[in-house]
Amino acid sequence: SSDYPLRDVYKRQSLNPVVVTPGADATAGARLAEELAGSFQLGAGQFCTKPGVVFVPEGSVLEEALPQHVGGGAAALLTPSITAGFDEGVRRLAATEGVSVVAGRLDPSGPDAQAHEGARPVVLAVDASTVAERPDDILTEVFGPVTVLVRYAADAGGDGLARALDALEGSLTATLHAAPGEPVEPVLRRLETLAGRVLFEGWPTGVAVNWAQHHGGPWPATTSAHTSVGATAVRRFLRPIAYQSAPAGSLPEALRDDNPLRI
């Protein structure tokens, strides 16, 4: 054993925001609703990359179409404590002023009822102005099959969406759905600061294990830029060292000019 154990590297919470632009909603809202339902309900909502908050224009096609894809029986979560946490988290969100249930339903309260039945998928909705005013009450991850739609005014110059996005903390992923030609640079620049993986026209739950994958994000998503998926995940156990003016013989072989390792 070592007197200097490896430091903890872990994932804390991640909302994995999704932004749907007015153009994307108008041209593909019904399809996006079906895909969102599949994404946030996958594995009973227990993926760390679950889309937990989705920004949609007011009066969106997506919101109207989503309820028909949400439902079914209760799903068993990994542990009783996770089930209880889901129940408590959903009820706390639903009780927040300005938040409403738009798909699914809340189970009867009480630990016995929820532990017995499991977790039922739920979709909540709230206006972007409420999120900007009360981010701590709404922008908190609930582990399980729930997502929150945030409605923004599409004709207000993007100010409402921008303020709501500014209230977000770091996530593993951020996703953008936009129609060709829509001006999305301000939104994209904000999403880049929020997440370690930025997706276009997709959903974040799938995580391919390959060299190109990056599974980490700004605090509070992870404690390290690299975590548990992809070939570069080993870097979470590494510490960078720079050598300045070192003679060749004192350098690790991988850094020597004569390249003895033929890298």
Residues of each region from the PLM?
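Short, small-residue-biased leader/transition segments that mark boundaries at the very start
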Residues: 3-10
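Flexible, glycine/charged-enriched surface loops at secondary-structure junctions
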Residues: 44-47, 51, 75-84, 100-105, ...
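NAD(P)-dependent aldehyde/semialdehyde dehydrogenase
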Residues: 8, 56-172
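Short, solvent-exposed loop/turn segments at the edges of secondary structure
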Residues: 12-15, 35, 47-50, 118, ...
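Long, acidic and serine/threonine-rich low-complexity regions
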Residues: 17-20
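C-terminal core of ALDH-fold dehydrogenases
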Residues: 112-119, 157-251
